[in-house]
Amino acid sequence: ELYRGELEGKKGITPILFTQFPYATVATTFSATNGVTDSAAAGTALATGNKTKNGAIGVLKDLETPVNSIAVWAKNAGYRVGVATSVSVDHATPAAFYAHAGSRSSYYNIGKDLYEAGFDFYAGSDFLDPTDKGKSESLYDMAEKNGYTIARGYKDYMKKCKKAEKMILFQPEAASQIDRSSIPYAIDRKKTDLSLQDITRSAINFLTKDQDKGFFLMVEGGKIDWACHANDAATTFHEVMDMDEAVKVAYEFYSQHPDETLIVI
């Protein structure tokens, strides 16, 4: 907030929207096996309410017993469901909402679980291992078989969204050829790059079309963590501000539907 204020040339802070929300709480962050969690165990705790072993996705610490997420509960209750991130769609945090794997590195099998879950909308940079290192059927080929349309970038999404029954939004192919693991950092972004704001807007647009029962959407600003690992303060600040822009998109929806919308950061 202080950095944002400095960028705007003023003394003091420019508040981030989600720090102004009326309620706050605390959570324990240790995993079932470690004092310091990782994204897989933390994602599983967030998604399912169960602590598990570091590295595990959607299973208990025995690495075998599956546990369902709030996203699965919502889908089973008839709501539309979306899972979105600024990193690969099969990365630990998004995967915890739809997959079950003893290892977060089982990217191909996690990708297959994406189709098994059958959620309405997924978004991220791409699949990390779409062909199981060339040994198995392409996850891209599975998309059409499972009723999904793949869009590459926001403009492509806008062209395809009306006719699509279920949607997977990825960054443009040219961007994935450079780095399929994530969309570019906000500080490096070009006009043609997919942004978390684009992803959030697309998700809400898709999940609310042709129905009014409601939806569940998880959106992750996944590169905040990466920038922190790199001890890159400026990049971290820009990623947080970028997440705030995505929250603003969700808040716009809340402003139109205040009695039936809950935003949790």
Residue spans for each PLM region:
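Formylglycine-dependent
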Residues: 117-120, 128-129, 165-192
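Active-site regions of oxyanion-processing enzymes, predominantly non-cytosolic
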Residues: 153, 157-171, 199-222
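Hydrophobic anchor at the start of a short beta-strand
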Residues: 81, 215, 261-263
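Phosphate/oxyanion-binding active-site loops and adjacent basic polyanion-contact surfaces
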Residues: 103, 192-200, 239-243
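N-terminal catalytic scaffold of extracellular/periplasmic and nuclease hydrolases
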Residues: 1-132, 137-161, 165, 241-242
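Active-site His/acidic residue clusters
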Residues: 92-98, 175-188, 203, 211-249
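Metal-dependent active-site segment of extracytoplasmic phospho-/sulfohydrolases and closely related
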Residues: 1, 242-265
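Generic beta-strand/beta-sheet core signal
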Residues: 84, 124-125, 170-173, 218-222, ...
